[in-house]
From Swiss-Prot:
It comes from Saccharopolyspora erythraea (strain ATCC 11635 / DSM 40517 / JCM 4748 / NBRC 13426 / NCIMB 8594 / NRRL 2338). GO terms for molecular function: proteasome binding; protein tag activity. Protein modifier that is covalently attached to lysine residues of substrate proteins, thereby targeting them for proteasomal degradation. The tagging system is termed pupylation. It comes from the Bacteria. Pathway: Protein degradation; proteasomal Pup-dependent pathway. Signal peptide: none annotated. InterPro entries: Ubiquitin-like_Pup (IPR008515). This is Prokaryotic ubiquitin-like protein Pup 2. Residues 1-34 are annotated as: Disordered. Residues 21-56 are annotated as: ARC ATPase binding. Strongly interacts with the proteasome-associated ATPase ARC through a hydrophobic interface; the interacting region of Pup lies in its C-terminal half. There is one Pup binding site per ARC hexamer ring. Belongs to the prokaryotic ubiquitin-like protein family. One of its GO terms (biological process) is protein pupylation.
Length: 62
């Protein structure tokens, strides 16, 4: 038994989707924020990795 693909409404199958120009600027900002956060985490780990890991260990079944 052959199944048919559901048809999409709003555009033809041949037509590529419209690019989102505003999304590109946001992606760069998010990438920069992520890089800054990762740099901060690296700094903490370099200074005191053992304490960083201990802060995430559950105590007493919490």
């Amino acid at each position: 038994m052959r199944q048919e693909k559901p048809k999409r409404h709003g555009r033809e199958d041949d037509e590529p989707p419209e690019p989102a120009p505003a999304g590109r600027a946001r992606d760069t900002t998010v990438g920069d924020d992520t890089d800054e956060l990762l740099d901060e985490i690296d700094g903490v780990l370099e200074e005191n990795a053992v304490e960083f890991v201990r802060s995430y260990i559950q105590k007493g079944g919490e």
